[in-house]
Curated annotation (Swiss-Prot):
Biological process terms in GO annotation: rRNA base methylation
Alphabetized UniProt keyword annotations: Cytoplasm, Methyltransferase, rRNA processing, S-adenosyl-L-methionine, Transferase
Residue positions binding S-adenosyl-L-methionine: 33-35, 52, 79, 100, 107
Stated name of the protein: Ribosomal RNA small subunit methyltransferase H
InterPro entries cross-referenced by the UniProt entry: RsmH, SAM-dep_MeTrfase_MraW_recog, SAM-dependent_MTases_sf
Length: 301
């Protein structure tokens, strides 16, 4: 398969990782290998450890990276477990960590994966094809209260109670377009002009299937001790739920830990403001539109 994937905010990632040729770097979301490939080119004496739980992504990215160098290792794992996986390799400190959150373009574009509300497929949405829970299970087996919670919390769907009740009434729902068309049919005409109403519903179901937000929380809890001094954590997010988790974590690590009257202590971490794609990148890659990059740098042990 030809890899036409365009990595988001690539130059900004490479600049802010401050790559050292002998450094150890972690890509928590390998995907099609776009970021990892460029990192590898710049660390000839270093090591790249990349994580993904999607077999399709791992297979294709492995070929991409092998064309550049062999000083990398790919681990099939949810990034929430990355600290344990690194420990198994004897790695306890790293020079930089990157996470490009959410769904990848190939996952959307491959209709058979069931992520797209524009292409017909079985309801799937599993990033890890070996796991049992799928979108079909969420749509057809969850009780109405749990559906309501998912739609409200993970999709920020305004009419979440109504949508959940209509999903229950229409069961069984077998395909992505069945679900998308159902949502469209029960959405007021004036709202249809704003955006496809299935977008947020599909987002909510996908997040539930892949346990995405809990994984982000668990991943972040492992970062603090792994970063060397002057090493950075870079996180690209694409929607407000992800970004809020990252923002709150960064604020927690950078805010003063002592009462104001206590002796001043130097901060251990420094966080930058969000970085957005340039106009040039937006013109080349429209899917980068909602991307935001946050950077946390460790400045003291």
């Amino acid at each position: 398969m030809k890899n036409n994937h365009i990595p988001v905010l690539l130059n900004e990632v490479l600049d802010n990782l401050a790559l050292k040729e002998n450094g150890i770097y972690i890509d928590l979301t390998l995907g099609m290998g776009g970021h990892s490939k460029e990192i590898l080119k710049r660390i000839p004496k270093g090591k790249l450890i990349a994580f993904d739980k999607d077999d399709f992504a791992i297979k294709n990215a492995s070929k991409t990276l092998s064309e550049v160098a062999n000083n990398f290792e790919i681990i099939k794992s949810d990034f929430k477990d990355f600290k344990e996986e690194l420990s198994n390799l004897g790695i306890y400190k790293v020079d930089g960590i990157l996470a490009d959150l959410g769904i990848s373009s190939p996952q959307i574009d491959n209709a058979e994966r069931g992520f797209s509300y524009l292409k017909n497929s079985a309801l799937d949405m599993r990033m890890d094809q070996s796991q049992k829970l799928s979108a079909y299970d969420v749509v057809n087996l969850y009780p109405v209260e749990k559906l309501e919670y998912i739609l409200k919390t993970y999709g920020e769907v305004k009419n979440y109670k109504y949508i959940a009740s209509k999903i229950i009434e229409a069961r069984p729902i077998n395909t992505t377009l069945e679900l998308a068309n159902l949502i469209k049919s029960v959405t007021p005409q004036k709202l249809l002009k704003l955006k496809n109403p299935a977008k947020n519903v599909f987002q909510a179901i996908r997040i539930e299937v892949n346990n995405e937000l809990d994984s982000i929380h668990q991943m972040l809890s492992s970062v603090e001790d792994l970063l060397k001094v002057n090493a950075s954590l870079l996180i690209i997010s694409f929607h407000s739920l992800e970004d809020k988790i990252v923002k709150n974590y960064f604020q927690e690590l950078t805010k003063p830990k002592l009462p104001s009257k206590m002796p001043i202590q130097e901060d251990k971490f420094f966080a930058t403001r969000r970085i957005y794609p340039s106009k040039q990148e937006l013109n080349l890659n429209s899917r980068s539109k909602s991307a935001k990059l946050r950077i946390l740098t460790k400045i003291k042990d």
